[in-house]
Swiss-Prot record:
Name of the protein in question: Deoxyguanosinetriphosphate triphosphohydrolase-like protein
Keyword set includes Hydrolase: yes
Organism: Rhizobium etli (strain ATCC 51251 / DSM 11541 / JCM 21823 / NBRC 15573 / CFN 42)
PANTHER family hit by this protein: DEOXYGUANOSINETRIPHOSPHATE TRIPHOSPHOHYDROLASE-LIKE PROTEIN (PTHR11373:SF43), DEOXYNUCLEOSIDE TRIPHOSPHATE TRIPHOSPHOHYDROLASE (PTHR11373)
Lineage: Bacteria, Pseudomonadati, Pseudomonadota, Alphaproteobacteria, Hyphomicrobiales
InterPro entries, alphabetized: dGTPase, dGTPase-like, dNTPase_2, HD/PDEase_dom, HD_domain, PHydrolase_assoc_dom
Annotated keywords: Hydrolase
């Protein structure tokens, strides 16, 4: 049966000239036949959702340890929220929604158990062997560590999806070849030897909307979780003019609203205003740049999808509030110290005795290795753990496991 692509409900004429074209991608590292019913970016998104790494996000920390309660966000719920915002932005700007969604869904694959605390601890123990970077780890997962296909390791994503993943925070190199944020992690350089991701250019606009969607979701939902936990109060939110304005708006319309509904009304307005701000900035910058292709977006001298100066200042104020009231809260700091101890202890135990990893694959690959490659394998194993698995593994090996409640 022949499929008429022109009659399918995607990839139509509404896509902007500067959008990524799902039918003429820059390919995959391992060539594959195309699908008659799905674009390459749809296939990327579907492959991402079916990975083990995606399922593990369910039990990885966003801010609060995954065992704290059913209503707090995990990496998985955060990822889904980012994907929803990215897709909305992509539709508004006439981009390829599947590419934007796929980049959003894969962006946190490399995160360790216990959030940034786990990443910092793993980076510390891996410093003698090159350190740890969650973006580079995400790339390793989708190009090497996921083992699902007969003909290759990884999930063989398109160049555009990998570019969006690697350039989540913008170009990694200056035009002169210097690192924009320090040395480029070696796994990224190694992959670029095989499939050059052009680290000195900006990513597609689809990848840019996925990145700014991450910021929008972080700020909004960390406030929501902070209020739920009691670490934040409405009075604290009043310190930020933008949030104070939203609260006044909600109170004026709903003067007797219960706290949970009041919170939701603030959050939905915050997301809406931030999304509209990004769309407005992108439209303005596109009107100046007048790009005629996705290549013109990459060659631009600045990011297109971003906050206005006023919203960027609000973003800084919100991050400062979250850092002060939540991330540096004494209770959270105690939990973070315990989480770091778990990661450090497990790394030392597995380096000393790889059989304690209780995985034939990892043990077989480590046998006889020198310390540097052994440490990288142990790091991969630890980074893939969920919060709950790391805690149970520590309890099996040690007499005392820190209380993370």
């Amino acid at each position: 049966m022949t499929v008429d692509r022109r009659a399918l409900g995607f990839g139509g004429s509404e896509r902007a000239v500067y959008a990524a074209d799902p039918w003429t991608t820059r390919g995959r590292l391992y060539p594959e036949d195309g699908s008659p019913t799905r674009s390459d970016f749809q296939r990327d998104r579907d492959r991402i959702v079916h990975t083990t790494a995606f399922r593990r996000l369910k039990h990885k920390t966003q801010v609060f340890i995954a065992q704290d309660g059913d209503h707090y966000r995990t990496r998985l719920t955060h990822t889904i929220e980012v994907a929803q915002i990215a897709r909305a932005l992509a539709r508004a700007l006439k981009l390829d929604e599947d590419l934007a969604e796929g980049v959003a869904l894969v962006h946190d694959f490399g995160h360790t158990p216990f959030g940034h605390t786990g990443e910092d601890a793993l980076h510390e123990v891996l410093l003698p062997y090159g350190g740890f970077d969650h973006n580079a780890q995400s790339l390793r997962i989708v190009t090497k560590l996921e083992r699902r296909y007969a003909e290759f390791d990884g999930i063989n994503l398109t160049w555009e999806s990998l570019e969006g993943l690697v350039k989540h925070n913008g170009p990694l190199l200056t035009p002169e070849g210097a690192g924009t944020r320090g040395p480029v992690p070696q796994p990224i350089l190694d992959y670029c030897e095989l499939h050059d991701l052009e680290l000195a250019t900006y990513a597609s606009l689809e990848a840019q909307v996925a990145a700014i969607a991450d910021d929008i979701a972080y700020n909004t939902h960390d406030i929501d979780d902070g209020l739920r936990s009691g670490y934040l109060t409405f009075d604290m939110l009043e310190e930020i003019p933008f949030l104070a304005g939203l609260m006044a708006e909600v109170r004026a319309r709903y003067p007797h609203l219960e706290p949970s509904r009041f919170t939701h009304e603030i959050m939905r307005r915050q997301i809406t205003r931030m999304v509209e701000d990004v769309i407005g900035v992108a439209q303005q910058r596109l009107s100046i740049l007048r790009p005629e292709s996705a290549a013109d977006i990459r060659a631009a001298d600045r990011v297109i999808a971003t906050f206005s100066d006023a919203m960027a200042e609000t973003d800084r104020q919100i991050k400062a509030l979250l850092f002060k009231r939540i991330y540096r809260n004494p209770d959270i700091m105690r939990i973070r110290a315990g989480a770091a101890q778990i990661v450090t202890d497990l790394f030392a135990a597995y380096m000393a005795s790889p059989k304690e990893m209780q995985s034939h694959y990892w043990v077989d690959h480590i046998a006889g290795l020198a310390d540097a490659p052994k440490a990288r394998h142990v790091g991969d194993y630890l980074a893939g753990m969920t919060d709950t698995y790391a805690i149970s593994a520590h309890r099996r090996l040690f007499d005392h496991t820190p209380d993370l409640r």
